[in-house]
Amino acid sequence: MNYKIPDIKERNIRFSKIKEAMQKNDIYALIIGGKGHWWTGRGYFRYLTDFHLWGHDGLIYFPIDEEPSLVLTSNAVANKISKRGWVNNCSGGLELGKELYNKLDIKKIRNKKIGIVGSESIIPHGVLNDLYEKLDIKNIVNATDLFDKVKMAKTEWEIKQIKNLWMLAQDTMVLFQDNIVGYSNNNKSQLEICSDINKVLWENGVRDLLVFYG
């Protein structure tokens, strides 16, 4: 599939796009929710850290004039995220609101507009209430749509990877189609057919467990 890990240039492009949108909306900082799951692990955290969450909840603090910081409900995974190099200030703890609060310069942000990303379905209700209570900032706005619109506009690297992924899917289906008579003649089971297809995907770097549901 010719997959290439995105470098720091890709990170900078994404960060610049987000900060441009923040500036247009007079938002000083974003607090972004992340939830590790098969479906949502590809979301906000992956976009900002290039690290796929399989479990754990987290928050990213993304100011317009400083490097972002991150808290996660696993210190070990937080350390792995920092080693990836996109967000370096990472720490773990079960009380996300408290952990993030300890990283902030409250005096600096007291009179600033803060945007929350993921308040509807990503950030747990208790964590969200804890944040509102601790921050005590009047000018908090919902910034989920803002972030989603930025994320929807794909970079050159993202477009290439999407194209590569679809080409891999196409090639895999053609391989199955070309061998379907042989599968029938050899009385191969559905499990054996899926295994043959998965071998192709694994050899090309596909590691998503959803493959096994095919």
Q: What residue spans do the PLM features occupy?
A:
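Long, charged, glycine-rich C-terminal linkers/tails
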Residues: 210-214
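Flexible, acidic/His-enriched mid-domain "rim/lid" segments that flank
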Residues: 1-3, 9-15, 95-209
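N-terminal accessory/capping or targeting/presequence segment of soluble
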Residues: 1-102, 167
